[in-house]
Design a protein with these regions (language model features):
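Glycine- and aromatic-enriched mobile tails/lids
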Residues: 22, 28-42, 46-184
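C-terminal catalytic lobe of FAD-dependent flavoproteins
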Residues: 1-24, 37-39
Length: 184
């Protein structure tokens, strides 16, 4: 197979790149599927229950997802009546903003976030790479916030802001991590 795509494994390495699916993690939850943020639940691949230890990709076992989904739903229903909900939400006011004609700016910035995270915050990490990632994300953040303030909020623009914020969170956690255990 490798030869058919131009890679001679007797003369060169097989290129390997990190992919999001292979990174372990998730939102730490309790037995009710609730995160450290009150009333925020996480189940399935976005959660980290610890049920299977460190050798599982997040918490993506089907049985685990079903059990935690059931627990989260039961817990949420049991506390639902304790909370008031604000139903008096004003209409969105985008007066003074313009439609984002420059979609290419958003698309390119999304590609840059992906490239930054793959190149500097992937499997192989160093303080130099993490610092570079942080600085690059900072530039993208400033550019995106400026665009957001003058544009109508679109799904793509909101997703870009979220991508940058998640990039910041992952990078910050990686910079603070002192216990670098390999996964089993």
């Amino acid at each position: 197979k490798c030869l058919s795509i131009g890679i001679d494994i007797t003369k060169e390495y097989i290129p390997v790149a990190p992919a999001a699916h292979y990174l372990c993690g998730g939102i730490k939850v309790d037995l009710d599927g609730q995160s450290s943020i009150r009333r925020l639940y996480a189940i399935g691949e976005c959660s980290c229950t610890g049920l299977h230890g460190g050798n599982r990709l997040a918490s993506n076992s089907l049985i685990e997802a079903v059990v935690y989904a059931d627990a989260a739903a039961k817990h949420a229903l049991s506390v639902l009546e304790r909370y008031d909900f604000n139903e008096d939400i004003p209409e969105w006011n985008d007066e003074g903003t313009i439609s984002t004609e420059e979609r290419v700016l958003i698309t390119q910035s999304m590609k840059e976030v992906n490239q930054i995270m793959e190149a500097y915050v992937g499997i192989v990490r160093s303080n130099t790479r993490l610092t570079r990632a942080w600085n690059r994300l900072d530039i993208l953040y400033e550019e995106t916030e400026a665009l957001f303030k003058r544009s109508k909020a679109t799904r793509e623009l909101c997703e870009l802001r979220n991508m940058i914020n998640v990039g910041y969170l992952i990078t910050k956690q990686a910079m603070e991590q002192t216990n670098k255990k390999p996964m089993n």
